[in-house]
């Protein structure tokens, strides 16, 4: 009878429990080896695991994150690869500045967002991703009266930097990585995320009608606290 044996290089990093070996803080690399077992009492299979610590530089950094997260999210949610084309625009450099000192929002194909045109195709309650400040994926919010909200919501999860999709059915943002949840305004309602999603001001240019994002430095109206992202 043969068995599969895996040698642990760092046994102290393994966590054991009733359901077997597990540990959320490490990655397990399985390397099977074949051995011959003798004797009537040696029945069954014996398994150990080689554990490898996750390097610190692989933990998403809020200051260095890439908008590629958005592309990957689209790959999970769209039914065909051909439909991924619009998401390529989020890999271009951050949107151009405006005369007011903010950043002009860009849509999924890289065009500047014009408020009147946007509202023709986005219904009340809609939350759709655009490219915002520093190139971050940012939600434009359409109010019940068919106007744009004066705030926009940064889509980057405050836990480990995943892009958080909006769940229309539950009317909340739910992170696909570790289950963090935020209400429809981006306020955290369930961990492990420690903080609410960042905000940006959403203005409309008087002359050209383009949507402009401006850094939010005032009190967070959702929590009454100073903005952690400023």
Curated annotation (Swiss-Prot):
Its EC number is 7.1.1.6. PROSITE patterns: RIESKE (PS51296). It comes from the Eukaryota. Residues 115-213 form the Rieske domain. It is a single-pass membrane protein. The chain crosses the membrane at residues 72-92. [2Fe-2S] cluster binds at residues 157, 159, 175, 178. InterPro entries: Rieske_2Fe-2S, Rieske_2Fe-2S_sf, Rieske_Fe-S_prot, Rieske_Fe-S_prot_C. Gene3D superfamilies: Rieske [2Fe-2S] iron-sulphur domain, Single helix bin. GO terms for molecular function: 2 iron, 2 sulfur cluster binding; metal ion binding; plastoquinol--plastocyanin reductase activity. Keywords: 2Fe-2S, Chloroplast, Disulfide bond, Electron transport, Iron, Iron-sulfur, Membrane, Metal-binding, Plastid, Thylakoid, Transit peptide, Translocase, Transmembrane, Transmembrane helix, Transport. It is an enzyme of class 7 (translocase). GO terms for cellular component: chloroplast thylakoid membrane. Belongs to the Rieske iron-sulfur protein family. This is Cytochrome b6-f complex iron-sulfur subunit, chloroplastic.
